[in-house]
A protein has these predicted regions:
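Metal/cofactor-centered catalytic core regions of large enzymes
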Residues: 1-567
Length: 567
């Protein structure tokens, strides 16, 4: 007899996410992903000055704010054919790399680690043994027995107080939890240390962006960061050196803690290298422009199909016609009018709610396709496209994780296993490791260019009072490819659409009734305890929807069986 699990709400970003699963014989047989809140931000920016849009649309999300801001500015600059000063590109790139580093660290430790780590088990750990386990694996200075003892005592104090605080309401003791006590203790210690590390990443964003979240320094035409090495109120030498100090600290944590912990989780949960396979078509945008027209990048983009790297088709610029012409959104299963696929520049956002229907409309999220196909975006897509493009540093970082995995298990991690729940987490770690090189590279490039006497960070845009101009701003955000599509008519915005990573991945069935990436990734997942569907949460978290969710389980007649809180 089948059961139905409803997880509602799931995510705190891009509105609210509801997941429904049918379970037969202990395995997910069908799934539905539903966005349960209408965003409507596209309607808000219509009839406004295109220079104002970035400040408004970064409020689409309270976590990945910076990405929406930069994508919107790029859309306006694309429409107006603006050549951005290279210093502005360097500053934007540093902000984006630091922001994404922050996002990836928060995802792994604060948002998804507790799907794999049993806090209560850490109470049984031997701190000396925990420290010894990391000998020859990590040189992190806080991996000592003394540090682990301090953390264990903190956990004991929390338990004794009866108030677990941030560790309350977890699935402690769940049969799917497999880490030994010492590894659980290590993970809890790193969880707490990550809180300080992510703060350092945010400091880089705030020092350049003015604040975080919701940076204030962008402008259509560059950035509002005047450079004067001798002036207190500008981007001067002292501030640049201060920023560099945080960049250096980030790299140590990412390499010696985050990367190692990723390999450890994979080593103790090898079955999750076989589960969670989603859409096998992957799409990624090139990122970190090194010229003023977004035509040359540090990271390549691309598209590949059927999980086959040999099908890779490079995407070399943000003006690539192959990329622009392939994107459509349909609303056959979403609560909007105009169900047929639409190109974003002609897209509409007219709500038409008429209730939930498994076979009809069930989401406020549209269904994007790339040349008619469902695709997955995100760090896994990013990693696979860079591997297919032959990017050496990507292969190096992946090989380092594979080597750690092999050292811990004696087994080889195969490429086919990356199309999985843990494959997404590995892809995110590889991305974060590479971002540390980007931070150093772009900081040094900025310093060198300033040393040549180039202090330019902004060019004044010319917005014609008549005529129509279209632009698109692509960006490889922490959760995948983001694009903002702007139409400027007679000096104001006449149409605006944002196709965000969560749209690509959490979209409902598309115009051809093909399931979305979230939905596909859940099918075939075994569920040990329907009252505690931890396995569903693990896979959804692997896409990084930043969630704290209330789980409701119902029986075949629709009656609620249990209500629990999931971290």
């Amino acid at each position: 007899m089948s059961q139905r699990i409803t997880i509602d709400p799931v995510t705190r970003i891009e509105g609210h996410l509801r997941i429904d699963c049918e379970i037969e014989n202990g395995v997910v047989s069908k799934a539905w992903a539903s966005g349960t809140m209408w965003r409507g931000m596209e309607e808000i920016v219509k009839n406004r000055d295109p220079r104002d849009a970035w400040m408004i649309v970064q409020r689409i999300c309270g976590v990945c704010t910076t990405t929406h801001a930069i994508s919107s500015v790029r859309a306006a600059e694309s429409a107006l054919n603006i050549d951005v000063p290279v210093n502005a590109q360097y500053i934007r790139n540093i902000i984006l790399a630091a922001h994404t580093t922050h996002d990836h660290i928060v995802h792994f430790y604060q948002l998804s680690a507790l799907d794999w780590v049993d806090i209560t088990s850490a109470l049984k750990a031997d701190p000396e043994k925990a420290s010894a386990m990391l000998d020859g694996v990590s040189s992190w200075h806080l991996n000592s027995a003394q540090e682990f003892t301090k953390v264990q005592n903190k956990i004991k104090d929390l338990v004794a107080s009866g108030q677990l605080g941030i560790f309350a309401n977890g699935y402690w003791g769940h049969p799917a939890m497999q880490l030994p006590p010492e590894v659980n203790l290590i993970a809890v210690a790193h969880y707490l240390q990550a809180l300080e590390c992510q703060r350092d990443a945010n400091r880089v964003v705030a020092l350049l962006g003015g604040k975080s979240p919701h940076i204030q320094n962008l402008a259509v035409g560059g950035v509002a960061n005047p450079i004067n090495l001798d002036s207190i109120g500008t981007l001067n030498l002292e501030r640049l050196m201060y920023i560099k100090s945080f960049i250096d600290k980030l790299s140590d944590f990412v390499e010696q803690v985050y990367k190692v912990d990723t390999a450890v989780i994979a080593a103790y949960y090898p079955e999750w290298l076989e589960r969670g396979k989603g859409a096998v078509n992957y799409l990624s945008a090139p990122e970190f422009p090194t010229d003023g027209k977004n035509g040359s990048f540090l990271f390549p983009g691309g598209y590949l199909t059927n999980a086959d790297l040999s099908t890779y088709r490079p995407i070399t610029s943000h003006s690539d016609e192959f990329l622009i012409k392939g994107i459509q959104e349909s609303a056959k299963h979403a609560w909007y009018k105009d169900e047929a696929p639409q190109a974003p520049w002609e897209g509409t956002t007219i709500p038409a709610y008429d209730g939930w229907s498994d076979d009809g409309k069930y989401s406020w999220v549209k269904s994007p396709t790339f040349y008619g196909k469902t695709v997955e975006v995100g760090p896994l897509a990013n990693m696979l496209c860079k591997l297919a493009a032959g990017r050496e540093s990507t292969q190096t970082k992946l090989n380092e994780i594979i080597a750690l995995y092999q050292k811990l298990t004696g087994k080889t991690l195969e490429m086919a296993q990356l199309h999985s729940t843990l494959g997404r987490i590995i892809g995110r770690t590889v991305h974060c490791c590479e971002l540390q090189n980007v931070l150093q590279d772009q900081y040094n490039a900025l310093i060198v260019n300033i040393g040549k006497g180039d202090y330019t960070t902004f060019v004044k845009p010319n917005i014609p009072a008549t005529g129509e101009f279209k632009g698109v701003g692509f960006l490889e955000a922490p959760r995948g490819m983001l694009s903002h599509w702007m139409v400027i008519k007679d000096g104001i915005i006449s149409n605006y659409q944002a196709v965000v990573p969560s749209t690509w991945n959490s979209g409902p069935r598309n115009f051809n009734d093909d399931v979305g990436p979230y939905e596909q990734s859940l099918v075939g997942t075994p569920i040990a305890d329907p009252a505690k569907p931890l396995e569903v949460v693990r896979t959804i978290h692997s896409f990084d929807p930043c969630m704290a969710c209330a789980v409701h389980v119902v029986d075949a007649d629709g009656n609620e069986v249990v209500s629990v809180k999931v971290l």
